[in-house]
């Protein structure tokens, strides 16, 4: 991101400036490095309450349902959900919670689950609401695996298997898609734009119910956004989200809390004692 680029740029220049002043090097090679660079950070989008309800109704009883529920109501990262085992899910406690202690990784093309989390702050205990408790209790009764999310063999999902699971969501969206036909050895590209409420031609039971995009990270961003909307303080949000850097939390907080002109106006007037 551009923010990371700026930090690295400053660090590199400080190192070479010190080296030049100490006569370690004759000339500072970092003088010509541009101060601007990096890619702008992607704008994070959260699902609305209506979109959340549509998503859950669309995939109820389907493979991605439990994954989506954990993302929406516990805010775990994709790798934390895929690496989650039942021994870290405490549903019968007075205050039910998920203990984040493991993460899913791909090494040499194979899935690996270990205790290597994204940051030290990712190790956390997340209390979970009643709707997620009920969902996980039902999933636990049906499960024969040590993993909360597993394949038909009871083992951890591979990257390819996760993509297949997520496809249950993408095929129900109205996003434009392409397919190819081959005529006389020539590849011809076709575009189709499904309409909301229509049935898929090759599968009449499948209905296009979502006119919005959903990604795994959007579930987590929705969780964080909802905490902020409900007035949860930034430090608590930071802990629950497992953010190592408070800046990450505060950036989201500022965008969510003060993204409407009328809200900004009331804050400014209150600060200066105006009505």
Where are these regions (language model features)?
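Key DNA-contacting residues within the recognition helix of helix-turn-helix
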Residues: 6, 13, 82, 225, ...
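Basic, Lys/Arg- and aromatic-enriched nucleic-acid-binding interface segment
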Residues: 2, 6-10, 21, 25-84, ...
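N-terminal core-binding DNA-recognition domain of tyrosine site-specific recombinases/integrases
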Residues: 1-24, 41, 155-161, 179, ...
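Short functional hotspots where side chains directly engage DNA or cofactors
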Residues: 95-100, 149, 215, 226, ...
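C-terminal secondary-structure termini that scaffold catalytic or DNA-interacting sites
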Residues: 93, 108-123, 130-132, 152-153, ...
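Short, basic (Lys/Arg/His-rich) helix/loop patches that form interaction surfaces
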Residues: 2, 57, 61, 74, ...
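DNA/chromatin major-groove-contacting recognition/catalytic segments
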Residues: 54-55, 109-114, 230, 251, ...
């Amino acid at each position: 991101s551009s923010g990371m680029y700026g930090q690295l740029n400053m660090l590199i220049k400080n190192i070479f400036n010190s080296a030049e002043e100490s006569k370690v090097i004759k000339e500072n090679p970092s003088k010509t490095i541009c101060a601007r660079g990096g890619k702008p950070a992607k704008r994070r989008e959260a699902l609305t309450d209506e979109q959340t309800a549509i998503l859950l109704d669309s995939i109820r009883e389907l493979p991605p349902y439990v994954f989506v529920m954990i993302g929406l109501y516990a805010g775990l990262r994709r790798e934390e959900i895929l690496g989650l085992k039942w021994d870290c899910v405490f549903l019968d406690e007075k205050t039910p919670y998920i203990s984040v202690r493991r993460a899913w990784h791909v090494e040499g093309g194979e899935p690996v689950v270990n205790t290597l989390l994204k940051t030290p702050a990712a190790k956390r205990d997340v209390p979970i609401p009643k709707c997620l408790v009920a969902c996980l209790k039902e999933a636990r009764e049906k499960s024969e695996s040590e993993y909360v999310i597993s394949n038909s063999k009871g083992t951890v999902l591979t990257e390819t298997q996760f993509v297949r699971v997520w496809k249950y969501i993408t095929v129900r969206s109205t996003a434009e898609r392409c397919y190819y036909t081959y005529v006389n050895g020539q590849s011809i590209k076709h575009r189709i734009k499904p309409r909301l409420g229509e049935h898929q031609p090759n599968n009449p039971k499948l209905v296009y119910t979502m006119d919005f995009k959903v990604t795994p990270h959007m579930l987590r961003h929705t969780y964080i956004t909802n905490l902020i909307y409900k007035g949860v303080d930034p430090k608590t949000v930071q802990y629950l989200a497992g953010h190592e850097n408070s800046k990450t939390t505060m950036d989201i907080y500022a965008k969510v809390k003060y993204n409407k002109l009328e809200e900004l106006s009331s804050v400014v007037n209150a600060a200066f004692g105006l009505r």
